[in-house]
């Protein structure tokens, strides 16, 4: 093939055989046996091939569903501990997508039901991270909704159908992809019924939202405005079937352990009754493992809503050892992230083991779980990250326990010189 530019080697005007543009309208015209193709058509062909290859890869990965053990193994790379929750989630997600792969097969008279998931665990125990990692692993659209912003239709606040709209936005309004996605609804415990007794006042952000979510979670056809527009009667709506969308609801459920303990420690009355001490109470995580649907109803979820979430997974409180592991072991561990930031400035960052212990202790004191680790490290490293880009001679930064406690500054090691550490400023 030859490259023809501007017709200099021939007086005849040449045209692209595909788009019909002349050689003067394009940058380059490539000649073949009695045919010509321009650079624009070559780019277009490359785009088409690239899209088809990506779609084929996505389809092949969708058909190859990892086993529960493989799913749990991948979760291990990102989430520390919570083995029981990982096992429950792995089996539930595997069965859900296995059900979707089988739904189009003819002659199968057994219809498999959907098993939505309820995650119960303290703040910062890894509920959201588990859901995010699952969606990334399965290559499906994923969105997070905050239950506290939802209200019944017709009231100020977000409509429950906005959840599906967010899911559509994640996959460029591809309805087929959205119908295979995962929705994580956070803070689900905050929409619990305000009182056990029916009230004259309408509870539009509590029981009202639970009622509105019922059909969405179980399976309905939701009408969603295209491209995020507002609803009006003359508008065309996108119809999204939610039967095959996996809903994962998560919440801290503060106080649920007391409901469980009251149920499990009820004794008889009289001289023969067993006397039980209040001090014999279990840890929150241990109590939550014994949760039953009735406990959730007493907490404030309506029975119908609890019934739509048949898979229960409880997460344990993170102890000091687990928090130290979270700081160093996962693929995207915080210490690795900050080390990478310093590496971009050609500086090594070292955390001593006593520093990691001090960070874990502080996070436990704040009762924020793993979520509090980043804010602690950010505060400790703020001044250093401010100064380092201006000090090209620094080669290493060392963080020990005293730095975390605020009694000294990080140790700075300079090239071809002695290490220096400034005293911590007086409070």
Curated annotation (Swiss-Prot):
Cite the SMART domains for this sequence.
AAA (SM00382), ClpB_D2-small (SM01086), zf-C4_ClpX (SM00994)
Under PROSITE patterns, the record lists: CLPX_ZB
Its keywords, alphabetically, are: ATP-binding, Chaperone, Metal-binding, Nucleotide-binding, Zinc
ClpX-type ZB domain location is 4-57
Give the binding site residues for ATP.
Answer: 122-129
| Gene Ontology terms describing biological process | cell division; proteolysis involved in protein catabolic process
Q: Which domain of life is it from?
A: Bacteria
GO MF terms held by the record: ATP binding; ATP hydrolysis activity; ATP-dependent protein folding chaperone; protein dimerization activity; unfolded protein binding; zinc ion binding
| One of the record's GO cellular component terms | HslUV protease complex
Q: Which InterPro entries match?
A: AAA+_ATPase, ATP-dep_Clp_protease_ClpX, ATPase_AAA_core, Clp_ATPase_C, Clp_protease_ATP-bd_su_ClpX, ClpX_bact, P-loop_NTPase, Znf_CppX_C4
Q: Which residues bind Zn(2+)?
A: 16, 19, 38, 41
Please describe the quaternary structure of this protein: Component of the ClpX-ClpP complex. Forms a hexameric ring that, in the presence of ATP, binds to fourteen ClpP subunits assembled into a disk-like structure with a central cavity, resembling the structure of eukaryotic proteasomes.
Function, in words: ATP-dependent specificity component of the Clp protease. It directs the protease to specific substrates. Can perform chaperone functions in the absence of ClpP.
- What's the family? Belongs to the ClpX chaperone family.
Q: What is this protein called?
A: ATP-dependent Clp protease ATP-binding subunit ClpX
Source species: Pseudomonas putida (strain W619)
Lineage summary: Bacteria, Pseudomonadati, Pseudomonadota, Gammaproteobacteria, Pseudomonadales
């Amino acid at each position: 093939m030859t490259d023809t530019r501007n017709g200099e080697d021939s007086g005849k005007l040449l045209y692209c055989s595909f788009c019909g543009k002349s050689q003067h309208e394009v940058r380059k015209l490539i000649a073949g046996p009695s045919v010509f193709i321009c650079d624009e058509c070559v780019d277009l062909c490359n785009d088409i091939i690239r899209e088809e290859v990506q779609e084929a890869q996505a389809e092949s990965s969708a058909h190859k569903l990892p086993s529960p053990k493989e799913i749990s193994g991948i979760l291990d790379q990102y989430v520390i501990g919570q083995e029981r929750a990982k096992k429950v989630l792995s089996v539930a997600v595997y069965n859900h997508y296995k059900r979707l792969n089988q739904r189009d097969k003819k002659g199968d008279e057994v219809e498999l039901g959907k098993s939505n998931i309820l995650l119960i665990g303290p703040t910062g125990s890894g509920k959201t991270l588990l859901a995010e990692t699952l969606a990334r692993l399965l290559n499906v659209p994923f969105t997070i909704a905050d239950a506290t912003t939802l209200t019944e239709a017709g009231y100020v606040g977000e409509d429950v159908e906005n959840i599906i709209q967010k899911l559509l936005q994640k996959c460029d309004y591809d309805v087929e992809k959205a119908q295979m996605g995962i929705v994580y609804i956070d803070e689900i415990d905050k929409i619990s019924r305000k009182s056990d007794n029916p009230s004259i006042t309408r509870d539009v952000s509590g029981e009202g939202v639970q009622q509105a979510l019922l059909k969405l979670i179980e399976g309905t056809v939701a009408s969603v405005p295209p491209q995020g527009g507002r609803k009006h009667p003359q508008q065309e709506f996108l119809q999204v079937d939610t039967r095959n969308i996996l809903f994962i609801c998560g919440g801290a459920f503060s106080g649920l352990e007391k409901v469980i303990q009251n149920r499990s420690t009820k004794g008889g009355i009289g001289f023969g009754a067993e006397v039980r001490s209040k001090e014999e109470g279990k840890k929150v995580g241990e109590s939550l493992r014994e949760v039953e649907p009735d406990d959730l109803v007493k907490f404030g979820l309506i029975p119908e809503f609890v019934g739509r979430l048949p898979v229960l997974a409880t997460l344990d409180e993170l102890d000091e050892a687990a928090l130290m592991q979270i700081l160093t072991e996962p693929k995207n561990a915080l210490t690795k992230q900050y080390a990478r930031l310093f590496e971009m400035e050609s500086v090594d960052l070292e955390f001593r083991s006593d520093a990691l212990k001090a960070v874990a202790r502080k996070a436990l004191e704040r009762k924020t779980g793993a979520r509090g680790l980043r804010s602690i490290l950010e505060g400790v490293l703020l001044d250093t990250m401010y100064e380092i880009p201006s000090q090209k001679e620094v080669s290493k930064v060392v963080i020990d326990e005293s730095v975390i406690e605020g009694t000294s500054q990080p140790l700075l090691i300079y090239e071809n010189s002695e290490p220096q550490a400034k005293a911590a400023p007086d409070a």
